[in-house]
Amino acid sequence: MSSGQSFSRSLMKLPLSLLVKSTSIPSNPVEDLNIDLSKPIVYALPFRSSVDILTLQKHALELGLPDPLSKLEINGKSLQRYVFISSRKTLLQDDDYVPSSSIEVFSELLSLHAEDSELDVQVIPATVLWGRKPGKENNQKPYLQAMNGLEKSKAVLLAGRDCLVRFSPVVSLRYMANSHGTDSTIAHKLARVARIHFSRQKLAASGPNLPSRQALFDRLLKSEAIKKAIEDEAESKNISIEKASKEAQDIMDEIAANFSYSLIKRGEKILGWLWNKLYQGLHISNASTVRKLAQDGHEIVYVPCHRSHMDYLLLSYVLYHEGMVPPHIAAGINLNFFPAGPIFRHGGAFFIRRSFKGNKLYSTIFREYLAELFAKGYSVEYFSEGGRSRTGRLLQAKTGMLAMTIQAMLRGMNRPVTLVPVYIGYEHVMEVATYAKELRGKRKEKENASLVIRTIRKLRNFGKGYVNFGEPIQLNQYLNEHAPEWTKDIDPMGTSKPQWMNPVVNDLATKMMTHINDAAATNALTLCATALLASRQRALSRDSLVSQINCYLSLLKNVPYSDTFTVPKDSAEDLVKHAESLNKFLIESDTMGDIISLDRHQSILMTYYRNNIIHLFALPSLIAQMTIRQHGLSIDAIQENVAAIYPFLKKELFLSYDEDQLESVVANIIDELVGQGMLVVSNNQVTINQSNSQALMLLGRTISETLQRYSIALNLLAENPDLDKSDLEQKSQDIAQRLGRLHGINAPEFFDKGVFASMFATLKQQQYLDNDGNCDLEKTQQFAKLLYSMLYPEVRLTIQESIHQAE
């Protein structure tokens, strides 16, 4: 670097420190990108720019990375630590060649790799983005282009507070040298590949160019499918084509988003303030996987679970904060009220009616609009459950949007389409008390401005929030495996609905929901709620609660549920203290210490938070309950019993293990419970360690209400094998309600009809019932007996008595 360059850069540092407030993506590149600090590092930037290199320098030093302006010493040679892939524009010329100095650095590095087989230089592509505003659709400029001095000065002044420094995955020059050689042409090839990479970086951060709304409507009106639907509408209603077209325009206006970058930018600041006011921190996991998908050009469809209206805002905020484009969000038409509707619409929401069966014009327009979003490359988000979960459990998926996504693919899309499951968790859901009232029969209050104002007035500290991105599902690959000839059904009109569609969509929906649950976030409140609700009086001493949380943490860490779920790093003591700070527990003291308990009202509300993570403990809890109630079993008997019950748990709780994995998972859980001193194994027999039985009993009770529900249905069926499906569901629900009242079961889902309906689908799948509803009596009686054996005597007696009274 010349002395003139050094001097000019020194002069720039002060104004840049005042004008530029940039963000690093990812926030911890050393960990997220697996950068090895013991190996040499070189930075690659898209354009020659002193402003960019100084901005990069600031972040590199803050993040513990080498200074890009320091020299790189390798085997006695001193090299520049950065390269520019393109020259900078000037006022007089628009140069776009690769600077010779960069080619020299690449060539020198490759030759050093040829001489030293141990050398591995890491190239870190880094892009400094000044503003993230997407362009207009008719703009033919490239996504990423060099700026001359005046343009860069303007960018610093106008977008200095909206600057991103994006670090990309490391490129190993050792790998390049081994795979492609070390001659001089490889240096030019590296530069060409880097240009494409940097352009994709910009596209991933800003998104595709945006059309004007009217231009979008005009394009949709020209689609053959909508023209045909308008003609059919005019004919069926006996109105003119013009009137039917006006109706179509009104529907488009009702549906379509009106994305505004300025609102997103301002909204990010407002939401940042809101999250800081509401929550004690947002924990985000696995965002790097999604960034890579966006950068690789995937059409991304986000499918989050739906806990709260906050979900709409939270996911968009997190994606923007992580350097990605907020998606277009399918929102219920009930949210299209003033002033929320226009704000949501500018934030990317497009609105969907709850039902449009039989309305061909509406369904055609909605399908075409969704296909247009996919075709233009906008990421999309929809809540696969169809509505917010009132119980805290994941609901069975509504498959309509998923089917329309597949239909959009059948138009012949060029880019891969990928579903990204998202688990959203809270230590406080602001609607949870309302959910409890609705489950007790209160009518749902319609969303309106006054409801929003009342909610805002209640804003207070809600603990922590969690956004975990689950394992992506690449739809092209999924269809190749489950409908190998799907490409033969490609139809540009988008009307194709092949025979394989329904079964494939249903299986895909289950896989999607399973991946959401796989990414669950455990936290202080969900763990404490699980423990307290498992105690008979909803109360534990502080020592017992801490001990139980330690049991849960050890299980989750030593027998991990999945690759994408998260466990708190805090100690059990700290988790209990944090949960107490949320003011949801009663704390009383006596001479022996603190007792932490739940009152009746909070007991009902806490079931919501327990249900968020109940699937993580389903198998450990089942094994614990089995050994407690049967006082000792062989390992083979435990394996056999778990195999019988597992299909029902898997269907209801979207458990991730396949049946062929069960044996090893059960063995690992038993080993862990032995390691924790709760079980003893001798001569293949598993027994309880009586000196440490409380933790095992609390663990077992987590699943006991689920087993009670199964026991009601199976024993009712065993006693009355001729009952049809609707009678069986109704009688099971009635008995569950009675059992709940008699034994103080507060869980709202305990007698939920939907849960029973799901169970009966599994009865058919497992051949307890045939397709005509006929019962395999011997098999049913055997299973009913197994379920009875895992219940406490007083509960079993109530069920037996209720079944006889129901006959």
UniProtKB/Swiss-Prot annotation:
Motif HXXXXD motif in this chain: 305-310
Look up keyword Cell membrane and say if it applies: yes
Cystine connections: none
Q: Which UniProt keywords apply?
A: Acyltransferase, Cell inner membrane, Cell membrane, Lipid biosynthesis, Lipid metabolism, Membrane, Phospholipid biosynthesis, Phospholipid metabolism, Transferase
**One BP annotation, GO:** fatty acid metabolic process
Q: What class of enzyme is it?
A: transferase
Please write the reaction equations for the catalytic activity of this protein: sn-glycerol 3-phosphate + an acyl-CoA = a 1-acyl-sn-glycero-3-phosphate + CoA
Task: Give the residue range of the signal peptide.
Answer: none
> Where does the protein end up?
Cell inner membrane
Q: How does it sit in the membrane?
A: Peripheral membrane protein
Q: Does the keyword DNA-binding apply?
A: no
Similarity-based family:
Belongs to the GPAT/DAPAT family.
Name under which the protein is recorded: Glycerol-3-phosphate acyltransferase
Name of the gene = plsB
